[in-house]
Each structure stands twice: as structure tokens, then as C-alpha cells.
Amino acid sequence: MLKEIRPAIFVLLALTLITGLLYPLAMTGLAVTIFPAQAAGSLITRNGQVIGSALIGQEFKDDRYFHGRPSATSTADPNDSTKTVPAPYNAANSSGSNLGPTSKALADRVKEDVDKLKAENPAQPVPVDLVTTSASGLDPHVSPEAAMFQVPRVAKARGVPEDRVRALVVKNTEGRLIGLLGEPRVNVLALNLALDAATATK
């Protein structure tokens, strides 16, 4: 019987070694060698300090900054471990809201967001990604339209011409991958850092 089982045990051990150890180590080594920044998490630093990742969004509330998409991520309620409380862009708990299209809570939240944005820029239609969450809750990008929509607010809060802020949006707009894949997008953290740098001295 051992003779019949031995090949199966050998294959199990060999595949475990190859796919569980050698392959991951080889891929990690290649990634660190060829794409060191991406392998380290695409971290963004300022003055030598890590302030975020290009792959994970952050919540911005100040009018002087561009805002990202709504985030439905949550964290454990410190007062009741059986419940959760909202924690936007919580990278330790990536998730969507799980609210369906007939949900009153979802409809009320979207309406509230739309009303706030219309008050901010009544002349322009509200871009859909400014009122809808991503599946992960961590999307670091908004559409160019969503960024442009916020230009008047940001420019007013910083006391700079709108054209200057608009030019930064254009400069920080990423195109489709190899011209075909995905949609044009703007990384909110990168844009806000560029905004800080450009307006440090007006």
C-alpha cells in the first residue's frame, strides 16, 4: 500500500515546495528587482515620511483639497464589538456598502451628497463617482470630470486662479493603459500633493 501512496506523497510535497515556497520567493525577488517601488506598496513620501500609497485612497475633508469618492469601509465599534462604525478608507477592512438599489439608506445618502455638491458648484452636473462608492472602498482615483468639478471650491479656498488649479488637474490626469485599457483618471493624493507644492508660494 505504501508503494501506491508514495507517488502521491512525493507529488504533494514537491508541489507544496514549488508553489508554496519557491514560486512566491522567485516572484517576490523579480518584483523587488524590476519594480521596487510597486513591490514595496507604491508608497508616497514627503520630507522623508511615508504619507500614503498611490494604490489606497485617503479621506480629505478640507475645502483646500480635492476630495475622493465616498468610502463605505468600517471598523469595529469600540463600545460594542458585535457592531461596526463607519471608517472611510480603512485599508484593513476593504469592502463595499452591500446596499442594494432599492435601499432607502443608500438613496438618502446619495441625495444628501448630491445636494451638498450642487451647492458647491450649481452650474455643473454632479459626476457620478463623487456620490458612489467603489467596490473596495479604497479607490485612490476620481475621474477627470470629478476633479474638474471641484476646481472652483479648491481655487476659492486657496485664493488662486481657477485656471492654475485646472492646469494641475490636466497635468495629473493619467491616461488609459497602453492607450486601450481602463479610463482616464486622477490620483487624488498625488493631485493634492502637487497642489500643495504649486501653491506653497503664490
From Swiss-Prot:
InterPro entries in the cross-refs: KdpC
TM stretches of this protein: 7-27
GO cellular component, one term: plasma membrane
Main localization, broad class: membrane
GO molecular function: ATP binding; P-type potassium transmembrane transporter activity
Biased composition (Polar residues): 71-84, 91-101
Positions of region (Disordered): 66-103
Pfam families xref list: KdpC
PANTHER family, per the entry: POTASSIUM-TRANSPORTING ATPASE C CHAIN (PTHR30042), POTASSIUM-TRANSPORTING ATPASE KDPC SUBUNIT (PTHR30042:SF2)
Family label: Belongs to the KdpC family.
Protein function: Part of the high-affinity ATP-driven potassium transport (or Kdp) system, which catalyzes the hydrolysis of ATP coupled with the electrogenic transport of potassium into the cytoplasm. This subunit acts as a catalytic chaperone that increases the ATP-binding affinity of the ATP-hydrolyzing subunit KdpB by the formation of a transient KdpB/KdpC/ATP ternary complex.
Subunit comment: The system is composed of three essential subunits: KdpA, KdpB and KdpC.
Protein name: Potassium-transporting ATPase KdpC subunit
Phylogenetic classification of the source organism: Bacteria, Pseudomonadati, Pseudomonadota, Alphaproteobacteria, Hyphomicrobiales
